[in-house]
Amino acid sequence: MKKTIKNSTHRPEDILVHAIKKRRSASGDVKNAVKLKEGEDYLRVEEEIPHDDNVVVIDDGCDHDHDVDDNDDDEEENGRYCRREFDHGYHLVKGQMGHGMEDFIVADTKTVKGHNLGLYAIFDGHSGSDVADYLQNHLFDNILSQPDFWRNPKKAIKRAYKSTDDYILQNVVGPRGGSTAVTAIVIDGKKIVVANVGDSRAILCRESDVVKQITVDHEPDKERDLVKSKGGFVSQKPGNVPRVDGQLAMTRAFGDGGLKEHISVIPNIEIAEIHDDTKFLILASDGLWKVMSNDEVWDQIKKRGNAEEAAKMLIDKALARGSKDDISCVVVSFLQWID
């Protein structure tokens, strides 16, 4: 079953998408994944994310164990476990770059092994939307289905990214077409596991004015050695940004089969604690970060209590500063502790 929701417009060339409350089935299945299809002027809401049973699981290396299944270590008061409530909102705008909408997001919750999970992601496609579309529908399922996710999330996420990319290259796109990814899994409002490839970014903001970027911008001028070690090169034309083999403005991405030998899909991963004064987790595509710094983003929304309003305010500010690209933003707000 599918639903469509008509959207109001900020101006004719924009597509604005406001926050939608998610539903969760008794079994914990993800419901109502947000999908804005290329060429459409409306939001299509899918009832359920399909699971891909054809992804081949491979082992691409080892990481030290970092157990995130820590129910036994939760803070206790009077013998009861304490957890942190959290909520989310999001906003998307189609840019003015002469192509269809290529940004896709996930903003959802589900329960797994007794944990309340927040699943948040930005997928910023390039040379088409097919890869970003596929990632929105499959990547979280592939991550959470890894048998060692709770015991060794870094190893599990790297394996899921790699196996998903292998499937994409074989079945979804040819030599052109790819996507960034920033995925964040919030666990009981206490801990967050963040992974990324490309230049979509995530930051954590605390009321003490501490703003921490928890992703890495995979830009060619910062990873020249990586590209060179794979047999590629980084070049820059006057007035343009550095590019891998003169083509791609990032060193890590899903897809991009024609450049795969010279780029990587292995993500940077960080596991962070949510502090008592942590207020927001913010994920956004580079349409926002090109015109606003991390500190400017925090300054704009620090007084906001509503995540949806915060996400819309940030995109409105980016538009006012002249951003022409697709812009997507997910804001997670951390609320009171509960037991």
Swiss-Prot record:
Mind telling me which InterPro entries this protein's record contains? Answer: PP2C, PPM-type-like_dom_sf, PPM-type_phosphatase-like_dom
Superkingdom as given in the UniProt entry: Eukaryota
Give residues annotated as binding Mn(2+) 2: 124, 286, 325
Q: How is the cofactor bound?
A: Binds 2 magnesium or manganese ions per subunit.
Name the needed cofactors: Mg(2+); Mn(2+)
Q: What positions does the entry give for Mn(2+) 1 binding?
A: 124-125
Q: Which Pfam families match?
A: PP2C (PF00481)
Q: Which controlled-vocabulary keywords does the entry list?
A: Hydrolase, Magnesium, Manganese, Metal-binding, Protein phosphatase
Q: PPM-type phosphatase domain: which residues? A: 87-334
Q: Identify the EC number(s).
A: 3.1.3.16
Q: What is catalysed by this protein?
A: O-phospho-L-seryl-[protein] + H2O = L-seryl-[protein] + phosphate; O-phospho-L-threonyl-[protein] + H2O = L-threonyl-[protein] + phosphate
Q: Does the keyword Hydrolase apply?
A: yes
Give the molecular function GO annotations: metal ion binding; protein serine/threonine phosphatase activity
Q: CDD domains from the entry?
A: PP2Cc (cd00143)
PANTHER family reported in the protein's UniProt record: PROTEIN PHOSPHATASE
Tell me its family. Belongs to the PP2C family.
Q: What is this protein called?
A: Probable protein phosphatase 2C 28
Provide the taxonomic classification: Eukaryota, Viridiplantae, Streptophyta, Embryophyta, Tracheophyta
